[in-house]
């Protein structure tokens, strides 16, 4: 697996056509875990190689779930240290080196923006509501509007760190995704696939509602026929 951090040297027009990857998915996972654990378990932060590897392979709050080895994580750490996204910390009396992220300094992020970005890095595509529900221990957002303000800040960075995806038919909220791995979400690809999936779901719901209405109408007709039959019988009693 290639863990090398990549930087863009393309022109602005090239960046608009396709986002340039800063990391691969494994490097992004390492950074996201450091950002997450800093907030969730400050007493165990900075993190050792073993703890960081376990965090990368965690089964909960991760999409996708990964299976990374310590050698792979160690190699990623060395690349990220060279690029100054991570710092190695040698604490007095500690037997092992520990590591901390430097995302705030690199991208001038306050904790609310870092929390939003961390959720997208760990969980993939999310709505603003989902980000708010899942970031409580990273940052307590008072409203979805506060989340959207953080998302807008990340989208306004150059190059942008986050993208807003097209709102699919039948959905109320836009969805957002990280651009750190050079993902591209054109309407003809991911956006269209999601829209088609959602549209299919809406179509199925409409069909179910139609069938339920037809069944209800048939029941009424049967009840009316039963009443007429009862009246007919009463004429001969």
Curated annotation (Swiss-Prot):
SUPFAM superfamilies per record: Winged helix' DNA-binding domain
Stored Pfam families: DUF480 (PF04337)
Signal peptide bounds: none
Gene3D superfamilies, per the entry: Winged helix-like DNA-binding domain superfamily/Winged helix DNA-binding domain
Ranges where the record places region Disordered: 1-21
Database matches in InterPro entries: DUF480, WH-like_DNA-bd_sf, WH_DNA-bd_sf
UniProt feature, compositional bias: Polar residues: 1-13
Family per record: Belongs to the UPF0502 family.
HAMAP family from the UniProt entry: UPF0502
Designated name of the protein: UPF0502 protein HEAR1280
């Amino acid at each position: 697996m290639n863990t090398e951090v990549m930087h863009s040297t393309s022109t602005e027009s090239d960046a608009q056509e396709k986002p340039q990857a800063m990391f691969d998915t494994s490097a992004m996972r390492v950074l996201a875990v450091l950002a997450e654990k800093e907030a969730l378990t400050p007493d165990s932060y900075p993190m050792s190689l073993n703890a960081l590897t376990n965090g990368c392979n965690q089964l909960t709050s991760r999409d996708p779930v990964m299976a990374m080895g310590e050698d792979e994580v160690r190699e990623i750490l060395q690349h990220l240290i060279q690029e100054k996204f991570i710092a190695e910390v040698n604490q007095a009396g500690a037997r092992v080196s520990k590591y901390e992220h430097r995302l705030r300094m690199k991208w001038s992020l306050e904790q609310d923006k870092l929390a939003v970005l961390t959720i997208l890095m760990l969980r993939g595509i999310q709505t603003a509501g989902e980000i708010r529900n899942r970031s409580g221990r990273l940052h307590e957002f008072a409203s979805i509007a506060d989340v959207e303000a953080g998302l807008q800040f990340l989208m306004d960075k150059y190059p942008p760190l986050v993208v807003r995806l097209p709102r699919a038919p039948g959905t109320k909220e836009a969805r957002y995704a990280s651009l750190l791995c050079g993902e591209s979400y054109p309407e003809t690809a991911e956006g269209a696939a999601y829209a088609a999936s959602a549209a299919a779901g809406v179509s199925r719901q409409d069909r179910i509602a139609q069938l339920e209405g037809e069944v209800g109408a048939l029941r009424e007709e049967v009840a009316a026929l039963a009443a007429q039959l009862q009246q007919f019988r009463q004429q001969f009693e």
